[in-house]
UniProtKB/Swiss-Prot annotation:
Keyword Flavoprotein on entry: yes
Catalytic activity: pyridoxamine 5'-phosphate + O2 + H2O = pyridoxal 5'-phosphate + H2O2 + NH4(+); pyridoxine 5'-phosphate + O2 = pyridoxal 5'-phosphate + H2O2
Gene name as annotated: pdxH
Protein name per UniProt: Pyridoxine/pyridoxamine 5'-phosphate oxidase
Function: Catalyzes the oxidation of either pyridoxine 5'-phosphate (PNP) or pyridoxamine 5'-phosphate (PMP) into pyridoxal 5'-phosphate (PLP).
InterPro entries: Pyridox_Oxase, Pyridox_Oxase_CS, Pyridox_Oxase_N, Pyridoxamine_oxidase_dimer_C, Split_barrel_FMN-bd
Taxonomic lineage of the native organism: Bacteria, Pseudomonadati, Pseudomonadota, Gammaproteobacteria, Enterobacterales
Length: 218
C-alpha cells in the first residue's frame, strides 16, 4: 500500500453518535442555563480542559485565524478570556470585534458555538484576575511578546528566570500589554451528535430582550 493509499484511509474513519439526543421540549428559555449544565457535565466527565474554546477572528484581508484559549468567566454579559494585547488575535479584534467561539466536547458528542462582539475588559477586572493567577503564570505573562518570531526556546526560559529574580519581592505588577476580552452573546448554537448523522442543532438568537430558539437541520 502506498503512502497515498494509507492517507486515503482517513475517508473511512467514522463512528456512530450514541450519547442521546436533544429535544426542543427539554430546552430552557435561557441559553446560559443549558451551557452551564453542559459545562458542568463536561467537568464531571473529567474531560481534559473542559473550558478550552476555539476563538476565531479575521484580519483586515478577511483571512480567518483560530486558536484555543481558556474560558475564565461567563454571565449574561458574555464570555471572558485573557491574552497578550500585542497578540495577533488582540490586533484582529481591535480591527474587527466580531468573533466566534467554539467549545468542542468530543467525548460527550457535543459542541457549543457562540457568535458575538468582543470588547476590552476594564483594567480593574483584568488586575483582579491577574493577581489570582499562580505567581509563575504572572511572570510568564511578562516574558513573551506573543506572536513575534523568536530564534530559540532558550530565549524565553532565560527571560523568565531574569524576571523571576526581578520580581522576587512583593507582587508581580500587571503588564500594560496584558488584558482580556468579553464576547457578547448574540447567538449560541448547541450541537448534540445523533445516530445516522441526524444530529440535533438548536440556535438561540437574541431578539431585543428575549431569546428566539430554532431547530437547525444537521
Amino acid at each position: 500500500m502506498s503512502d497515498n493509499d494509507e492517507l486515503q484511509q482517513i475517508a473511512h474513519l467514522r463512528r456512530e453518535y450514541t450519547k442521546g439526543g436533544l429535544r426542543r421540549r427539554d430546552l430552557p428559555a435561557e441559553p446560559l442555563t443549558l451551557f452551564e449544565r453542559w459545562l458542568s457535565q463536561a467537568c464531571d466527565a473529567k474531560l481534559a480542559d473542559p473550558t478550552a474554546m476555539v476563538v476565531a477572528t479575521v484580519d483586515e484581508h478577511g483571512q480567518p485565524y483560530q486558536r484555543i484559549v481558556l474560558l475564565k468567566h461567563y454571565d449574561e454579559k458574555g464570555m471572558v478570556f485573557y491574552t497578550n494585547l500585542g497578540s495577533r488575535k488582540a490586533h484582529q479584534i481591535e480591527n474587527n470585534p466580531r468573533v466566534s467561539l467554539l467549545f468542542p466536547w468530543h467525548t460527550l458528542e457535543r459542541q457549543v458555538m457562540v457568535i458575538g462582539k468582543a470588547e476590552r475588559l476594564s483594567t480593574l477586572e483584568v488586575m483582579k484576575y491577574f493577581h489570582s493567577r499562580p505567581r509563575d503564570s504572572q511572570i510568564g505573562a511578562w516574558v513573551s511578546k506573543q506572536s513575534s518570531r523568536i530564534s530559540a526556546r532558550g530565549i524565553l526560559e532565560s527571560k523568565f528566570l531574569e524576571l523571576k529574580q526581578k520580581f522576587q519581592q512583593g507582587e508581580v505588577p500587571l503588564p500594560s500589554f496584558w488584558g482580556g476580552f468579553r464576547v457578547s452573546l448574540e447567538q449560541i448554537e448547541f450541537w448534540q451528535g445523533g445516530e445516522h448523522r441526524l444530529h440535533d442543532r438548536f440556535l438561540y438568537q437574541r431578539e431585543n430582550d428575549a431569546w428566539k430558539i430554532d431547530r437547525l437541520a444537521p
